[in-house]
Amino acid sequence: MMISGVEISEKSGSAVFRLKAQPRSSKSAISGAYNGGVKVNLKAAPVDDAANRECCDLFAKVLSVSSSRLTILSGKSSKNKTIKVEGLGAEEVALLLRPYL
């Protein structure tokens, strides 16, 4: 499913989408769509997994789920990541992300 330039797929009842993280930003926020994924600015530096934790916490808040339901499938040490949201389908995630895109 494509929403505002972001591809969200569904695998085994979980939504999966890509993102590009921009660490060391002035504030943490979703800043729109980027190359088929979500662009997100993070205050945290990419040290000791801090930026990954902040990324999961931000999306947990936006999607109204526990951060334990978010998993970084790929890109833990990269700016380009693939995120899985357990318990939410692609359509639900699309509706919740739409205001930020």
Swiss-Prot record:
Q: Which Pfam families does the UniProt entry name for this protein?
A: DUF167
Instruction: Provide a GO CC annotation, any one.
Output: cytoplasm
Family named by the database record: Belongs to the UPF0235 family.
The family database entries (SUPFAM superfamilies) matched by this protein are listed as:
YggU-like
* Gene source species: Chlorobium phaeobacteroides (strain DSM 266 / SMG 266 / 2430)
Q: Which domain of life is it from?
A: Bacteria
Q: Which PANTHER family does the UniProt record give?
A: UPF0235 PROTEIN C15ORF40
> What is the protein's given name?
UPF0235 protein Cpha266_2081
